[in-house]
Curated annotation (Swiss-Prot):
One of its GO terms (biological process) is positive regulation of attachment of spindle microtubules to kinetochore. One of its GO terms (molecular function) is microtubule plus-end binding. Component of the DASH complex consisting of ASK1, DAD1, DAD2, DAD3, DAD4, DAM1, DUO1, HSK3, SPC19 and SPC34, with a stoichiometry of one copy of each subunit per complex. Multiple DASH complexes oligomerize to form a ring that encircles spindle microtubules and organizes the rod-like NDC80 complexes of the outer kinetochore. DASH complex oligomerization strengthens microtubule attachments. Within the complex, DAM1 and DUO1 may form the microtubule connections. On cytoplasmic microtubules, DASH complexes appear to form patches instead of rings. This is DASH complex subunit DAM1. Keywords: Cell cycle, Cell division, Centromere, Chromosome, Chromosome partition, Coiled coil, Cytoplasm, Cytoskeleton, Kinetochore, Microtubule, Mitosis, Nucleus. Residues 18-34 have a biased composition (Low complexity). Residues 1-48, 157-179, 205-224, 286-339 are annotated as: Disordered. Residues 120-150 form a coiled coil. Residues 1-13 have a biased composition (Basic and acidic residues). The lineage of its organism: Eukaryota, Fungi, Dikarya, Ascomycota, Saccharomycotina. Component of the DASH complex that connects microtubules with kinetochores and couples microtubule depolymerisation to chromosome movement; it is involved in retrieving kinetochores to the spindle poles before their re-orientation on the spindle in early mitosis and allows microtubule depolymerization to pull chromosomes apart and resist detachment during anaphase. InterPro entries: DASH_Dam1.
């Protein structure tokens, strides 16, 4: 605020001693007035001494205090005017700051800050978990009610009472006193020469049993002397002998396949071997008797002449000598040599 405005405010403010008094009536008492000459005061003093004394007291004591009060009131009025301006400025600032704070608050409500900690996600997860547990509880209660109403189909196995069992020494093996009966050859064993289910190394038939062996288990007539067949044998038997042979060997598992894939039966055709089986030790006598004695001489002569590849010459000489000496009818009936 400039100095001119302060002067105008001071001039506009006028303090009077009384509202009804005339402004020009007592102005002469505030200071020395130029209207009255200096000699007039002396004449008045002569008239009355009491009035002079009162005028002196007012001029010396009361008028300076009133003048100070007037100046203080003018200063107070100016300060109050300044304070009013400051208050108005603060009101404007308060409105602006409040508007700014309100906008920031609205933005903080509408925007989800990622770094601000909040429990919304955790509370949602807890509510979902409680709902899932409630559904699981209802399902378990329904299952329990269903099992309580329905008859129990589960049989509890009795646990063996091991406390009452006493330790018993193992008994010595019993010596078998049964008479050994020669095994009966079944239909499946008759064609053992061309059967690939046999082992490559076949042991001779054991006529007796050792004393420590357990007694033989009784078997039914259908399962006696029967061996397990591979997939290749099943295909070969089904393709060559027809569905009757498969039903006889495999049981009722191939009835559906035999019914859907009928193959005509060829009774005159013999089963062919998928591989060369082993030769029994007891059957080597036929090979020795059928060979001519001159086979060994041919082998030695061939070795002396060539001197190389004795194994190939030996096999060729043996095969030639055996094929030349043994007739075709006997060669078909016996088993081929082990390779």
């Amino acid at each position: 605020m400039s100095k001119e405005s302060v002067r105008e405010s001071k001039a506009a403010t006028e303090y009077r001693l009384s509202i009804s008094s005339n402004p020009g009536s007592r102005r002469s008492s505030f200071g020395g007035s130029s209207e009255h000459p200096a000699g007039s005061g002396i004449g008045n003093n002569k008239a009355s001494n009491g009035e002079l004394r009162e005028a002196t007291l007012v001029d010396t004591l009361l008028l300076p205090q009133v003048q100070e009060l007037k100046d203080s009131m003018i200063t107070l009025d100016a300060n109050l005017t300044h304070m009013n301006f400051i208050h108005e400025s603060l009101v404007d600032l308060n409105e602006s700051v409040s508007a700014l704070l309100y906008g920031l608050m609205c933005n903080s409500w509408c925007v989800d800050f990622p770094n601000m900690p909040h429990h919304t996600a955790r509370e949602l997860g807890i509510s979902k978990e409680l709902a899932r547990l409630k559904e699981e509880k209802q399902q378990l209660l329904a299952d329990l009610q269903g099992t309580a109403q329905a008859p129990s189909l589960v049989l509890k196995e009795k646990e063996p009472n091991t406390s009452k069992q006493k330790f018993q020494l193992p008994k010595p093996p019993m010596v078998s006193t049964r008479s050994v009966v020669a095994p009966v050859r079944t239909i499946s064993e008759e064609e053992e020469d061309d059967n690939t289910a046999a082992s490559f190394v076949s042991n001779p038939t054991v006529m007796g049993q050792p004393p420590h062996a357990p007694p033989p288990v009784a078997r039914s007539n259908n399962a006696k002397g029967r061996r397990r067949y591979s997939i290749l044998q099943q295909i070969r038997n089904h393709d060559l002998t027809g569905q009757k042979h498969m039903v006889a060997n495999l049981g009722g598992t191939v009835k559906a396949r035999a019914a859907t894939h009928p193959i005509p039966e060829s009774a005159g055709e013999k089963r062919k071997s998928l591989a060369v089986s082993a030769v029994r030790i007891g059957n080597n006598k036929r090979l020795q008797t059928s060979r001519p004695p001159s086979g060994g001489r041919d082998v030695t002569m061939a070795r002396k002449r060539s001197g190389t590849q004795p194994a190939i010459l030996n096999t060729n000489s043996i095969t030639h000598s055996s094929t030349g000496a043994v007739p075709a009818s006997s060669a078909q009936g016996r088993r081929p040599p082990f390779r």
